[in-house]
From Swiss-Prot:
Residues 611-762 form a coiled coil. It holds the Pfam family Kinesin. Belongs to the TRAFAC class myosin-kinesin ATPase superfamily. Kinesin family. Residues 64-507 form the Kinesin motor domain. One of its GO terms (molecular function) is ATP binding. It is linked to Cardiomyopathy, familial restrictive 6: A heart disorder characterized by impaired filling of the ventricles with reduced diastolic volume, in the presence of normal or near normal wall thickness and systolic function. RCM6 is an autosomal recessive, severe form characterized by prenatal onset, irreversible heart failure and early death. ATP binds at residues 160-167. Mitotic kinesin required for chromosome passenger complex (CPC)-mediated cytokinesis. Following phosphorylation by PLK1, involved in recruitment of PLK1 to the central spindle. Interacts with guanosine triphosphate (GTP)-bound forms of RAB6A and RAB6B. May act as a motor required for the retrograde RAB6 regulated transport of Golgi membranes and associated vesicles along microtubules. Has a microtubule plus end-directed motility. This is Kinesin-like protein KIF20A. Keywords: Acetylation, ATP-binding, Cardiomyopathy, Coiled coil, Cytoplasm, Cytoskeleton, Disease variant, Golgi apparatus, Microtubule, Motor protein, Nucleotide-binding, Phosphoprotein, Protein transport, Transport. Residues 763-890 are annotated as: Globular. The keyword Ribonucleoprotein does not apply.
Length: 890
């Protein structure tokens, strides 16, 4: 099998295209009788490093990305659940207003002072629930299909939450198709009579083609038939093909390249018409008018269909096999850095019916599952690509390629709504890829707004963004269709979708990536002027030709020697360019090294200064610590020396006393005592003195400990702070009672005086009745006063009972203190007896603790005479108040 891989030019349909010189990856193999041998078979790669032409972006290239919004109608079940709360409102053709409903997170955040309850978004155009599929297609996608037929690449992707109508917008139903079947119908209706009959050129990589021989063409047709038949094995198809070829050879018909394809096409039509005719009525009368296309161009249409499920790529048009596990595909890059899906099946289609059937086959292989919001939700990103090869002439020129990709993005949904592990994993991968897409769009917008500081666009963080990379970076254009669910329960997700689309609507289409490669004719012309004077005349004769004719001239018109000369000239230019680039690289390296050396020097200087400052700070800190340590040591040793001096003075004083005693003893003693006895007595006295000193030190230590215990017990004897308020209240009540007693005493004195005056009056007057009345009133007054006094005395009794309890507790503590003091005094007396040999003296008696704190009132016997007059007389005899008949002993 021999094959050649060709990369198409970009200037076959329009004279305004800048790209003229094609890029060839591999043409070393012989392609047989079908492929021309002189198609640059002597050079493997044609490249140039001449100065690229500066491309001035036109107004079309600076056009913003189209973002369309479509609102789906509410279902009857949703109306029954009261989902229609007016949260999605279309203000005009370009403005959408979102009002947060009750129970939504946005409204709760607004009540807490975070966010807004009303949001307003602007789109390219908004379509309400009443807009049908045909109107939506004519107003949005029809112009894009027209651009694709002219050679432009377009990406159309739908975005929205689950159950918002994305798949319905892309595919539609059998009766009312979406933008994908209508795009296929419009493409094939516009290209009627201009389709290339044989699939001898097949798309490869990102924007290249490969030439197929007859065997490879049969394999492609068998692959398509196996997909359309839905399980027919390739062996059966190959036997039917061999049988048809044998019959044609028996009747004398020569099997040519075209006839084999025609026969295979007829077989495929017969087979597919019997098995998949359920949608044949859809394409019988298309409702789309054809678009004008150039008449001198033929077209070859290829389709592919794959999905991205859990960040893995699967081919949805893979032929059926016995293996249950699907084969994963790899996402690679070609030599120009353009991403492509390796081993992806590209199927050649002749009409829209075949494309629609292949779409249905791919839909059967797609990943679907039931979610919280949709019973049949697609859990993967599916991408359906239509690649059109634009062929001019007899097929001996490398074709131009245009592509229309329609992507049905999986719906975003909250992960907390997914209960099972598989659905949770799917939702996480879907949200991750959509989040990466949002990051890429935000980075592209920031780079377009701030061209001085370009940020890295994270295309490689997700498979989806790597597939979209070419359309976002100038290899094509993109369009977003936002589908909105007007239900109130999905308002928060709808708001997130609207914010995402608002960022995408600010993007500007990147200018096309066109490299200003010069034409091959310019190389030959320039080289002929420099090298061969004989070719100068021919070059001057060709100067009158038009530049477009030169760019589109056939390569076969040049001889082998001229092409070799061109190769040599290109080699010299390449060497020269490499030398210049090497010099530039060396210059840049020198500059970078110098800058790095300067930075290192600055860094070293800063580090040295920092070290010096740190060293000074550490020296100061440790000097302060040393000074503090010196001061503490000097003070400590001074105290030790002072204590030692005091002890020495005490010992010297004791020694002097002992000497004085010894001298006095010697004087009082007999002079006839022997010197030896004096020495023994002196030594014994010194020993006793030392023992007494030791005991004295021990007694002092015990005295200190006992004094400390005494202080503790004194603190314990003090009333607790919790009892202070109670004692204060008792004192206040006692003072009030004493005041009342004083008042009552004054009243009694007044009453006594009145009684005395009454007695005097009784002596002079004969009105005994008046005197009796006065006595009765006085008795009543005295009774009342006695009652008040009784109440006061009862209160005082209660207070004194409480005080007695506290006094008992204090007395117990006082006895313990006395015992301890007795022990201490006994130890002191023992020490003084041993030292001075004096008789024990009793310590002065101490007054009992709190003996006079609560003086008792003297008791008095109740008088037998309880008449009011007797009580008045007793009160007159004593100035102090005596207890009445209600007095008690306490």
């Amino acid at each position: 099998m021999s094959q050649g891989i060709l990369s198409p030019p970009a200037g076959l349909l329009s004279d305004d295209d800048v790209v003229v010189s094609p890029m060839f990856e591999s043409t070393a193999a012989d392609l047989g009788s079908v492929v021309r041998k002189n198609l640059l078979s002597d050079c493997s790669v044609v490249s140039t490093s001449l100065e690229d032409k500066q491309q001035v972006p036109s107004e079309d290239s600076m056009e913003k990305v189209k973002v369309y919004l479509r609102v789906r109608p509410l279902l009857p079940s949703e109306l029954e659940r009261q989902e229609d709360q007016g949260c999605v409102r279309i203000e005009n053709v370009e403005t959408l207003v979102l009002q947060a409903p009750k129970d939504s997170f946005a409204l709760k955040s607004n009540e807490r002072g975070i966010g807004q309850a009303t949001h307003r978004f602007t789109f390219s155009q908004i379509f309400g629930p009443e807009v049908g599929q045909a109107s939506f297609f004519n107003l949005t996608v029809k112009e894009m299909v027209k651009d694709v037929l002219k050679g432009q690449n377009w990406l159309i992707y739908t975005y929205g939450v689950t159950n918002s109508g994305k798949t319905h917008t892309i595919q539609g139903t059998i009766k009312d198709g979406g933008i994908l079947p209508r795009s296929l119908a419009l493409i094939f209706n516009s290209l009627q009579g201009q389709l290339h009959p044989t699939p001898d050129l097949k798309p490869l990589l990102s924007n290249e083609v490969i030439w197929l021989d007859s065997k490879q063409i049969r394999q492609e047709e068998m692959k398509k038939l196996s997909l359309l038949n839905g399980g027919l094995q390739e062996e059966e198809l190959s036997t039917s093909l061999k049988r048809s070829v044998y019959i044609e050879s028996r009747i004398g018909t020569s099997t040519s390249f075209d006839s084999g394809i025609a026969g295979l096409s007829s077989i495929s039509q017969c087979t597919s018409s019997s098995q998949l005719d359920e949608t044949s009525h859809r394409w019988a009368q298309p409702d789309t008018a054809p678009l004008p296309v150039p008449a001198n161009i033929r077209f070859s249409i290829w389709i592919s269909f794959f999905e991205i499920y859990n960040e893995l790529l699967y081919d949805l048009l893979e032929p059926p096999s016995q293996q249950r596990k699907r084969q994963t595909l790899r996402l690679c890059e070609d030599q120009n850095g353009n991403p492509y899906v390796k081993d992806l099946n590209w199927i050649h289609v002749q009409d829209a019916e075949e494309a629609w059937k292949l779409l249905k086959v791919g839909r059967k292989n797609q990943s679907f599952a039931s979610t919280h919001l949709n019973q049949n939700s697609s859990r993967s990103h599916s991408i359906f690509s239509i690649r059109i090869l634009h062929l001019q002439g007899e097929g001996d020129i490398v074709p131009k390629i245009s592509e229309l990709s329609l992507c049905d993005l999986a719906g975003s949904e909250r992960c907390k709504d997914q209960k099972s592990g598989e659905r949770l994993k799917e939702a996480g991968n879907i949200n991750t890829s959509l989040h990466t897409l949002g990051r890429c769009i935000a980075a592209l917008r920031q780079n377009q707004q701030n061209r001085s500081k370009q940020n890295l666009v994270p295309f490689r963080d997700s498979k989806l963004t790597r597939v979209f990379q070419g359309f976002f970076t100038g290899r094509g254009r993109s369009c977003m269709i936002v589908n909105v669910n007007p239900c109130a329960s999905t308002y928060d997700e709808t708001l997130h979708v609207a914010k995402f689309s608002a960022i995408a609507s600010q993007l500007v289409h990147a200018p096309p990536m066109q490299l200003g490669f010069p034409s091959l004719h310019s190389f030959i012309k320039e080289h002929s002027l420099q090298v061969s004077p004989s070719l100068e005349k021919g070059a001057k004769a060709d100067t009158g030709l038009d530049d477009d004719i030169e760019n589109e001239a056939d390569i076969s018109m040049y001889g082998k020697e001229e092409l070799l000369q061109v190769v040599e000239a290109m080699k010299t230019l390449l060497l020269k360019e490499r030398q210049e680039k090497l010099q530039l690289e060396m210059h840049l390296r020198d500059e970078i090294c110098n800058e790095m050396v300067e930075q290192m020097q600055q860094r070293e200087q800063w580090c040295s200064e920092h070290l010096d400052t740190q060293k000074e700070l550490l020296e100061e800190m440790y000097e302060e610590k040393l000074n503090i340590l010196k001061e503490s040591l000097t003070s400590f040793y001074q105290e030790e020396i002072q204590e030692r001096d005091e002890k020495i003075e005490e010992l010297e004083a004791l020694l002097q006393e002992a000497r004085q005693q010894s001298v006095a003893h010697q004087q009082s003693g007999s002079e006839l005592a022997l010197r030896r006895s004096q020495r023994l007595a002196a030594s014994a006295s010194t020993q006793q003195l030392q023992e007494v000193k030791a005991k004295l030190q021990q007694c002092k230590a015990e005295l200190n400990s006992t004094t400390e215990e005494l202080h503790k017990y004194q603190k314990m004897l003090e009333p607790p702070p919790s009892a202070k308020p109670f004692t204060i209240d008792v004192d206040k009540k006692l003072e009030e009672g004493q005041k009342n007693i004083r008042l009552l005493r004054t009243e009694l004195q007044k009453l006594g005086e009145s009684l005395q005056s009454a007695e005097r009056a009784c002596c002079h007057s004969t009105g005994a009745g008046k005197l009796r009345q006065a006595l009765t009133t006085c008795d009543d007054i005295l009774i009342k006063q006695d009652q008040t006094l009784a109440e006061l005395q009862n209160n005082m009794v209660l207070v004194k009972l409480d005080l007695r309890k506290k006094a008992a507790c204090i007395a117990e503590q006082y006895h313990t203190v006395l015992k301890l003091q007795g022990q201490v005094s006994a130890k002191k007396r023992l020490g003084t007896n041993q030292e001075n040999q004096q008789p024990n003296q009793q310590p002065p008696g101490k007054k009992p603790f709190l003996r006079n704190l609560l003086p008792r009132t003297p008791t008095c016997q109740s008088s037998t005479d309880c008449s009011p007059y007797a009580r008045i007389l007793r009160s007159r005899r004593s100035p102090l108040l005596k207890s009445g008949p209600f007095g008690k002993k306490y």
